[in-house]
């Protein structure tokens, strides 16, 4: 959504196409089409051969955003363990249960929208590539942002079959986009494709409203923050263990946790935080901020942010958001984090999975407020210089234009179609 908006502000015609569910954002929603491959219909197609054969007018009403949103409120699971067979049928494309829905998307793109460039938002949409290329001859890309994490949670035989299908599908795109050098190298090996097929594109954030500034926070409790989706992979348990160590030495310190909590992670969350509830004001769960302003207020309340993931994070958007509000970070030395810390100079790296090392890094920032402020200032300035949405749009438009020119699709104003 941020990417689409930034390109539009630079004069490109960009259409954001929601798939599976309506797009949920904490800023202006740039959605430019109906929902395709609506989640309810995808599931019913998979479960019922009769449903697949129904005419479109009898099914399309279930793609209405309010209906899909209502369905998700009743605990529709997105747990990868339960979605193995459905994932496979999506990746099988026109050979699977979703063939008619995929054909509708392909016709919309190739016959109605007619963009100069198409970018699919994840590997699970790669089952649409074959059909799209029957209706569209321009450059086609797929961006990867952590697809391996989902795939690795699939039970067998679904994991192996899904990986096989993705490897075959993405061979057909002109390139695969990623946000870090780490992920470029990793996914090259994971998908068994030449690294030259992968292209790094800048990750940027919309700085509007991020009005936090580096502050010595003198007189305020030292507050540690965790902001990410609540699940084991994101490492909340690592933060809790480290905070228990740190809080013993500094009883006035606080831990603030924010992020979406799905039903599949409720048991993990309760077990992980059960000892924190006795700390009263020293611990607070903010939930998932309902607005952009609430999210920014969360960041501004912190002395330091840590999201010590167990998995290797491919981009680290929360790092940029914290730094944009003058909050330094302490992160594990894996995934995209070393690149981000090196380029922003806004935080510290610690050995992964080591709560004591994490607590020691917080201790360093607690004891040396000037050093903490130095990291905050450096990160604050460099995010604005190197990771803003305008620069992201400029670089990606330049990248896409080269492919448009090479394909002979020259227009004064390129029309770009990034998927969500």
Where are the regions a protein language model picked out?
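Conserved acidic donor-binding segment of nucleotide-sugar-dependent glycosyltransferases
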Residues: 343-344, 348-355, 364-369
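A conserved catalytic-core segment of Leloir-type glycosyltransferases
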Residues: 16-107
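Acidic donor-binding loop of glycosyltransferase active sites
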Residues: 300-314, 327
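A short, well-ordered alpha-helix in the C-terminal region of glycosyltransferases
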Residues: 357, 364, 371-385, 392-398, ...
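Glycosyltransferase donor-sugar binding loop
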Residues: 254-270, 285-288
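Nucleotide-activated donor-binding/catalytic signature segment of Leloir-type glycosyltransferases, i.e.
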Residues: 269-293
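Conserved donor-binding/catalytic core segment of Leloir-type glycosyltransferases
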Residues: 216-234, 240-247, 256
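Carbohydrate-associated surface elements
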Residues: 182, 204
């Amino acid at each position: 959504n941020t990417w689409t908006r930034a390109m539009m502000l630079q004069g490109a015609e960009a259409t954001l196409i929601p798939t599976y569910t309506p797009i949920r954002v904490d800023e202006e929603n740039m959605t430019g089409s109906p929902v395709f491959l609506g989640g309810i219909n995808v599931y019913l197609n998979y479960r019922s051969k009769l449903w697949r054969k129904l005419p479109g007018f009898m099914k399309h009403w279930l793609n209405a955003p309010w209906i899909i949103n209502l369905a998700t409120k009743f605990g529709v699971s997105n747990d990868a363990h339960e979605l193995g067979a459905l994932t496979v049928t999506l990746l099988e494309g026109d050979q699977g249960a979703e063939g008619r829905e995929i054909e509708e998307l392909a016709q919309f793109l190739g016959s109605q929208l007619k963009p100069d460039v198409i970018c699919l938002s994840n590997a699970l949409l790669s089952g649409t590539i074959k059909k799209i290329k029957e209706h569209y001859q321009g450059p086609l890309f797929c961006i990867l942002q952590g697809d391996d994490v989902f795939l690795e949670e699939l039970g067998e035989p679904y994991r192996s079959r899904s990986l096989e299908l993705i490897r075959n599908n993405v061979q057909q795109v002109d390139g695969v986009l990623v946000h870090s050098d780490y992920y470029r190298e990793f996914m090259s090996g994971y998908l068994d494709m030449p690294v030259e097929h992968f292209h790094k594109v800048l990750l940027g954030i919309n700085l509007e409203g991020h009005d936090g500034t580096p502050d010595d926070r003198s007189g305020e409790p030292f507050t540690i923050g965790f902001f990410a989706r609540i699940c084991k992979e994101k490492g909340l348990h690592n933060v809790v263990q480290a905070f228990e160590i740190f809080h013993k030495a500094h009883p006035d310190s606080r831990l603030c946790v924010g992020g979406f909590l799905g039903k599949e992670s409720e048991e993990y969350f309760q077990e992980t935080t059960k000892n924190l509830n006795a700390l009263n004001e020293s611990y607070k769960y903010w939930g998932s901020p309902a607005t952009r302003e609430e999210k920014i207020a969360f960041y501004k309340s912190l002395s330091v942010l840590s999201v010590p993931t167990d998995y290797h994070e491919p981009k680290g958007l929360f790092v940029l958001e914290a730094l944009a509000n003058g909050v330094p970070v302490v992160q594990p030395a894996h995934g995209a984090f070393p690149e981000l810390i090196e380029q922003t100079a806004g935080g510290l790296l610690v050995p992964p999975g080591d709560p004591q090392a994490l607590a020691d890094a917080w201790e360093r920032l607690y004891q040396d407020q000037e050093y903490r402020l130095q990291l905050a200032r450096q990160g604050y300035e460099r995010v604005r210089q190197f990771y803003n949405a305008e620069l992201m749009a400029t670089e990606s438009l330049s990248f896409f234009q080269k492919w448009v020119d090479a394909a002979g699709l020259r227009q004064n104003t390129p029309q770009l179609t990034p998927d969500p």
